[in-house]
């Protein structure tokens, strides 16, 4: 289970948003995230808001889709009553947890509720996450028939001892099969990898990258393992049972990923994400990084509309109680002030290749550009043309770049 909620104000039971949420809504895209908070087992490194069967306090997975639909319907009423104009949905993303633990009919039911309420924009991106051992060819075909366009498989590694440390439940041999089945169903394919697992060597990481690239995914994400407080992995490291990966090793892993992916024709478009073309970038995640609007459905889901951010109660039992009681599931919220929105803009947009317009920075930030070029943290040619774009070194030190641009 995830950590504590963010610090914010209590959310009203009716969920109504302040008038500021409606300002300039039509200049922002609108997406929907649907959180499915169920997993067969809890991986030792995972800090996401997920629950195994023994942690559900009597809540039934089979009831979840209907309750999520209740929130979708409530979202329509809340946005309308708050004066936020109705917009078609540009992206839909099912995350978790393991969304594909639910029957396809349940995912289709939730997607239909989104489509019926708001409509899907032309060419809308509809993604679900999946574990390689949670789907088969028939399931993936049914996803495509229901309107899904993309599947993101949690491959994580191709090396058995790394998967064992992460406590992943699939065999490496399963990944090529599910990719083949997804392709046959007409779905775009993304693979998620994790690097820096304790005990993982650079040769192990190379093997995982080469295996992933041999499958020719449209998109690949490579995330550094972050050891979160409260997880089993954190306890193992604290007790000395497992040795953590140091920062220099993490940098070596990242540099190898960028080298192999670039050689295979993948372009980085966000610090941890690469795609074969602009068309295969994750548009849903780009919406997060560029400050668009989205409604997050489900326990622990976060939403953002016009500078107003809120988050739902975490446990499925609490979520079920509020949905069946006709109350908003929001536990808290905050309205971002101008300085906070500006800091978040720099924090998020500096990570993407399209970058930040130099002219949009503060005077102090613009002055800092020259020293960032000198330190080889940003691309000199791009900066002189008016855009902040991180170099490879800058991607490794992205947090430092943000501090210097925003101080």
Predicted feature residues:
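Flexible, acidic/Gly-rich N-terminal and inter-domain linker regions that tether
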Residues: 1-33, 40, 86, 380
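C-terminal scaffold of the Radical SAM
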Residues: 15-29, 49-363
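Local cysteine-cluster metal-coordination motifs and their immediate loop/turn environment
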Residues: 35-50
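Short amphipathic alpha-helical interaction segments
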Residues: 362-376
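A short, conserved structural fragment
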Residues: 373-385
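Minor-groove-contacting beta-hairpin "wing" of winged helix-turn-helix DNA-binding domains
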Residues: 385-391
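Short, amphipathic alpha-helical interaction segments positioned at domain boundaries
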Residues: 392-407
């Amino acid at each position: 289970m995830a950590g504590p909620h963010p610090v914010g104000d209590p959310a009203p039971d009716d969920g109504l948003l302040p008038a500021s949420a409606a300002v300039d809504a039509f200049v922002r895209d609108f997406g929907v995230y649907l959180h499915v908070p169920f997993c067969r087992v809890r991986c030792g490194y995972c800090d996401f808001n997920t629950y195994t069967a023994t942690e559900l306090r009597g809540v039934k997975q089979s009831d979840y889709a209907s309750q999520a639909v209740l929130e979708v319907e409530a979202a329509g009423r809340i946005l309308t009553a708050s004066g936020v104009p109705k917009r078609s949905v540009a992206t839909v993303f099912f995350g978790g947890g393991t969304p594909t633990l639910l029957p396809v009919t349940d995912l289709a039911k939730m997607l239909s509720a989104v489509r019926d309420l708001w409509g899907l924009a032309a060419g809308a991106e509809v993604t679900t996450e999946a574990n390689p051992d949670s789907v088969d060819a028939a399931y993936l075909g049914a996803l495509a028939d229901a309107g899904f366009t993309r599947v993101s498989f949690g491959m994580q590694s191709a090396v058995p001892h790394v998967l064992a440390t992460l406590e992943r439940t699939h065999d490496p041999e399963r990944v090529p099969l599910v990719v083949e089945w997804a392709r046959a169903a007409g779905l775009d394919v993304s693979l998620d990898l994790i690097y820096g697992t304790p005990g993982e060597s650079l040769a192990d990481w190379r093997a995982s990258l080469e295996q992933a690239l041999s499958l020719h995914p449209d998109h690949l994400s490579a995330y550094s393992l972050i050891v979160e407080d409260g997880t089993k992995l954190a306890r193992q490291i604290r007790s000395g049972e497992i040795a953590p990966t140091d920062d220099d090793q993490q940098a070596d892993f990242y540099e190898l990923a960028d080298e192999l992916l670039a050689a295979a024709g993948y372009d980085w478009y966000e610090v941890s994400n690469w795609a074969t073309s602009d068309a295969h970038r994750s548009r849903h995640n780009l919406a997060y990084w560029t400050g668009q609007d989205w409604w997050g459905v489900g326990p622990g889901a976060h939403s953002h509309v016009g500078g107003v951010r809120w988050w739902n109660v975490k446990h499925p039992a609490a979520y079920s109680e509020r949905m069946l009681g006709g109350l908003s599931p929001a536990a808290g919220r905050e309205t971002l002030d101008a300085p906070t929105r500006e800091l978040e803009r720099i924090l998020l947009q500096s990570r993407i290749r399209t970058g930040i317009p130099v002219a949009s920075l503060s005077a102090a930030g613009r002055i800092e550009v020259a020293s960032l070029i000198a330190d080889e943290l940003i691309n000199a040619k791009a900066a002189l043309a008016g855009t902040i774009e991180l170099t490879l070194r800058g991607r490794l030190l992205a947090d430092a770049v943000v501090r210097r641009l925003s101080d």
